[in-house]
Amino acid sequence: MRNIQIALTKGRLEKHVIPLFEKIGIGCSELKDKGRKLVFKSKNTNISFILVKAVDVATYVEHGVADIGVVGKDILMEFEKDIYEMVDLGVGVCKFCVASIPTYNPKSYRKKRIATKYPHITSTYFHDKGEDVEIIKIEGSVEIAPLLGLADAIVDIVETGKTLQENGLIVFEEMCSISARMIVNKAALKTKKDEIFRIINMMEQEILSGK
């Protein structure tokens, strides 16, 4: 069997995705006690894992460094990559939301300033609504932007809403739901078709059995 390299995201999705691979018989013991390592071999299989930042997973898959990747739908929406999106894993579910301080008026005709880590998604959303907004890209915590007057509102991913609540913000609009997706390199799907579809089929069966 040909070797398969899978790119996973470090952080939020990691805790949801590793159990899925274990349930379909792909050992991930080294991922649980990884230290500073970023490349791991699954024992007794032809599969290895690489751990990278979420924004880089699709890039590694697009360029063929990884055959398969698991990444949030937010990354695929923000950064359009030449890959195949194969499976909605149904984990890491959260929502894109417009949030601000309680006095924010979403119906105001004044041009709004929106702070976000996701300028493409935000611009598309407001454009589709027919609203002209100024997008301010923020790399760190966006919750502070309305509090300091940098922006009228923010667009961000909301999982529990706890961070918003702690900063005195509330959700005004729910834009869309997102979750973890399995993506595949286009060339690998041809050259390693059997190996890749074996993983995909097992994952789909596991997801269906868990519903």
From Swiss-Prot:
Keyword ATP-binding applies: yes
EC number: 2.4.2.17
Catalysis performed (reactions): 1-(5-phospho-beta-D-ribosyl)-ATP + diphosphate = 5-phospho-alpha-D-ribose 1-diphosphate + ATP
GO biological process entries: L-histidine biosynthetic process
UniProt GO cellular component terms: cytoplasm
InterPro entries noted in UniProt: ATP_PRibTrfase_cat (IPR013820), ATP_PRibTrfase_CS (IPR018198), ATP_PRibTrfase_HisG (IPR001348), ATP_PRibTrfase_HisG_short (IPR024893)
Pfam families named in the record: HisG
Keywords assigned: Amino-acid biosynthesis, ATP-binding, Cytoplasm, Glycosyltransferase, Histidine biosynthesis, Nucleotide-binding, Transferase
Domain remark from Swiss-Prot or TrEMBL: Lacks the C-terminal regulatory region which is replaced by HisZ.
PANTHER family, A to Z: ATP PHOSPHORIBOSYLTRANSFERASE (PTHR21403:SF8), ATP PHOSPHORIBOSYLTRANSFERASE ATP-PRTASE (PTHR21403)
Name of the featured protein: ATP phosphoribosyltransferase
Organism annotation: Bacillus mycoides (strain KBAB4)
